[in-house]
Amino acid sequence: MIVYCLDYEPIAELKIMLKSYLYKNITEAGCDEAGRGCLAGPVVAAAVILPKNFKHDILNDSKKLSAKQRAVLKDEIISSAISWKVGFVNNDEIDKMNILRASIRAMHIAIEGLEKEPQFLLIDGNRFYPYKNVKHKTIIKGDGLFFSIAAASVLAKTFRDEYMIKIHREFPEYNWDKNKGYPTFAHRAAIIKYGITPYHRKSFSLFNTQLKIDF
């Protein structure tokens, strides 16, 4: 089945719509991060509280969407959300605390910035450190199950991509406008040729010839 929506590209095999909430009568925030496996730049997380009746035909895991779709969805999420926030943890802090702790720290920053305090957190993945006394549930591939997590996925990805495009202007040799700091062959080749920048994560295997990092 192919689903079409005005101003969007078609998505094939979209079988079921995501869930609007886990618990109906409490305020839930969905949380996700972007940039965990990159060699350069920050890890960025978002927290989003959506109305309980929020529905969307296209919103899903940001990795399944095109850049054009994410850009349109970013504006729709921001205008529809009850509250939203993004949190950044830069590469120096990542090197100090490790990428897992930095990813969760970015989520905490985003949650803390919400104008409305959540009563429950839906966390993408399987690892999280509790935020204050707020209860939470970790959900593997949650960005493909709940709208709030998918919305957080889109915001984290789009805000991080915009940041990487901005710093690309300082160091165009690394093609961050295209690879966004991920360990592509061209990115690693540029590191070997030009060395590292102030935005690179020194605790990562920057000069390894492998094309990706597994966590």
Which functions belong to the PLM regions below?
Residues 12-215:
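RNase H-like, Mg2+-dependent phosphodiesterase core
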